[in-house]
């Protein structure tokens, strides 16, 4: 019996079954125990293989690929702590809905809990975070091929959002053997190998998303909140809300064009709050809201009806409003609930928004600062490109001070909102679309995922990584952290420059000293091509202080 050959046949069938469910990208880390999966992936012409030496970054690379492609993406890792490194990406996918298939190679059962090398208890290691978990048996020809393929089909049918963990034990030997062995085992599936469909096709129940009383509510005073959604959905929602005459408060990830910009500033204005209090219904599309003032208003508002529309199941409303949780893609809901052209009922908000935007423009006009970069970020975006926004302070500054174009693709990891894996995720987004990409992160985020520069340097289109170096986690300057301990225990300044990091990975590098230089250097990157790290050094707490000052000033306009 050739164990190594049957391991590979088993793995080949597993991967072929996944490809029938839309898996095209597969991310692979080095390892011996995962050899059957790796060789099967390399031999499958339907799969595009990506490699990385760091499993944590590999998981986030897959996350980025899944975000931008909207298709499930598979990951192959070896046994032991290699598998555990996928945890952060799995958690993020569970919160933001990307479909990840984690194929964790494992030792066979007789090598667990006996002191064998690189052997840990992997079944169930991710607790409740996977949507579906499978612990496959050791490959054996005694198990029909139809069982394996239908098991994968059944699991994928359940995977609407989040992760699928497939634990794959393989016994040695892992290499060599006559490739013709066990061909009869695979042949039992007949002409399925020439087909392109799953072995077991399961229909999904269609949710009832139409609201019978919509014709009544669309005549009332409504407010639209736009959270995370696709670029197409954001553009469609903006047009829908404008036709309806309802004010739209757009998050930085909404891709709606934020028709009422600087919302996280003017929402602090008492006059704006009085107008919004007249709303009879609030419709929130998408989750993961960023702005503090928006979250405060969202928590305090008391309309007669609060509807939340998102394709991801779950409550998604930390304020626990009484209302309706509608599980539906945004575009499908809008198509089933047409707008009726009406005169805007809250025109005063346009004035407050324009005043806030003008005040920000005047206050930041002569600055080269973190806040100024956030305010003018739209000027740096590549044509027909995309934007990846980091977490912590920079995303809040862009949300509060910037205005991004409607329908322009924006990606981020705003589920668990960690700073781990941001560069790797951005690399995955770029690979999935092959578009020019601007990514912007803070210095600690860049340090946290520094080896992902090895992924970014393989970008297929012009890519610019903007590192806003404010020397530490300056978001803590926005919080009432103990002043005496703030730098040591919260901000943790590292006093680094990224010039040598860029050189180590063969990236272009520049450090502009003015807004004009920044614009010129970014424009050159789009023309020249390649990958460039642009470091923007700013005073440590200036960004946080500027945001606080602008909130106070706009509230008094």
UniProtKB/Swiss-Prot annotation:
Its cofactor is Mg(2+); Mn(2+); thiamine diphosphate. This is 2-succinyl-5-enolpyruvyl-6-hydroxy-3-cyclohexene-1-carboxylate synthase. It holds the Pfam family TPP_enzyme_M_2. The lineage of its organism: Bacteria, Pseudomonadati, Pseudomonadota, Gammaproteobacteria, Enterobacterales. InterPro entries: DHS-like_NAD/FAD-binding_dom, MenaQ_synth_MenD, MenD_middle, THDP-binding, Thiamin_PyroP_enz_TPP-bd_dom, TPP_enzyme_TPP-bd. It catalyses: isochorismate + 2-oxoglutarate + H(+) = 5-enolpyruvoyl-6-hydroxy-2-succinyl-cyclohex-3-ene-1-carboxylate + CO2. SUPFAM superfamilies: DHS-like NAD/FAD-binding domain, Thiamin diphosphate-binding fold (THDP-binding). Belongs to the TPP enzyme family. MenD subfamily. It comes from the Bacteria. The keyword Transferase applies. Catalyzes the thiamine diphosphate-dependent decarboxylation of 2-oxoglutarate and the subsequent addition of the resulting succinic semialdehyde-thiamine pyrophosphate anion to isochorismate to yield 2-succinyl-5-enolpyruvyl-6-hydroxy-3-cyclohexene-1-carboxylate (SEPHCHC).
């Amino acid at each position: 019996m050739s164990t190594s050959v049957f391991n590979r046949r088993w793995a080949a069938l597993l991967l072929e079954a996944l490809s029938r469910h839309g898996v095209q990208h597969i991310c692979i880390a080095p390892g011996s125990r995962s050899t059957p999966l790796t060789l099967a992936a390399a031999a499958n012409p339907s799969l595009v293989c990506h490699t990385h030496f760091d499993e944590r970054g590999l998981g986030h690379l897959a996350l980025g690929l899944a975000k931008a492609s909207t298709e499930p993406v598979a990951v192959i890792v070896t046994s032991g702590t290699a598998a555990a490194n996928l945890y952060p990406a799995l958690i993020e996918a569970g919160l933001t809905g990307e479909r990840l298939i984690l194929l964790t190679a494992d030792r066979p059962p007789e090598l667990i809990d006996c002191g064998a090398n690189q052997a840990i208890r992997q079944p169930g290691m991710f607790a409740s975070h996977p949507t579906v978990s499978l612990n496959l048996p050791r490959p054996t020809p005694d198990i029909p091929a139809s069982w394996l393929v239908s098991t994968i089909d059944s699991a994928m049918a359940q995977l609407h959002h989040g992760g699928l963990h497939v634990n794959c034990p393989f016994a040695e030997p892992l290499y060599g053997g006559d490739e013709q062995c066990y061909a009869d085992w695979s042949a039992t599936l007949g002409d399925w190998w020439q087909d392109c469909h799953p072995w077991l096709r399961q229909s999904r129940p269609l949710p009832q998303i139409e609201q019978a009383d919509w014709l009544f509510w669309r005549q009332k005073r409504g407010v639209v909140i736009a959270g995370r959604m696709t670029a197409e959905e954001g553009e469609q929602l903006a047009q829908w809300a404008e036709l309806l005459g309802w004010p739209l408060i757009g998050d930085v990830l909404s891709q709606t064009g934020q028709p009422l910009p600087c919302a996280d500033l003017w929402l602090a204005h008492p006059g704006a709050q009085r107008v919004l209090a007249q709303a009879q219904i609030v419709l929130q599309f998408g989750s993961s809201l960023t702005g503090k003032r928006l979250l405060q208003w969202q928590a305090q508002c008391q309309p007669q009806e609060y509807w939340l529309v998102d394709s991801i199941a779950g409550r998604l409303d930390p304020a626990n409003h009484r209302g309706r949780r509608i599980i539906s893609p945004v575009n499908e809901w809008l198509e089933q609930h047409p707008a009726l052209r009406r005169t805007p009922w809250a025109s005063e908000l346009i004035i407050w928004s324009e005043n806030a935007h003008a005040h920000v423009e005047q206050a930041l006009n002569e600055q080269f600062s973190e806040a100024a970069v956030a305010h003018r970020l739209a000027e740096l975006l590549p044509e027909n490109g995309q934007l990846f926004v980091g977490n912590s302070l920079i995303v809040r500054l862009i949300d509060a001070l910037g205005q991004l174009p409607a329908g322009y693709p924006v990606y981020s990891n705003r589920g668990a909102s960690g700073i781990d894996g941001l560069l790797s995720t951005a690399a995955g987004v770029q690979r999935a679309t092959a578009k020019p990409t601007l990514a912007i992160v803070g210095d600690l985020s860049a340090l946290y995922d520094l080896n992902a520069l090895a992924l970014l340097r393989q970008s297929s289109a012009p890519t610019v990584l903007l590192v806003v170096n404010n020397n530490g986690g300056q978001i803590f300057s926005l919080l009432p952290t103990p002043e005496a301990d703030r730098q040591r225990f919260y901000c943790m300044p590292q006093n680094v420059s990224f010039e040598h990091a860029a050189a180590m990975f063969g990236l272009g590098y520049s450090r502009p000293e003015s807004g004009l230089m920044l614009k010129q250097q970014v424009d050159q990157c789009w023309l020249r091509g390649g990958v460039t790290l642009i470091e923007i050094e700013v005073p440590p707490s200036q960004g946080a202080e500027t945001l606080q000052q602008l909130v106070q000033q706009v509230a008094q306009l």
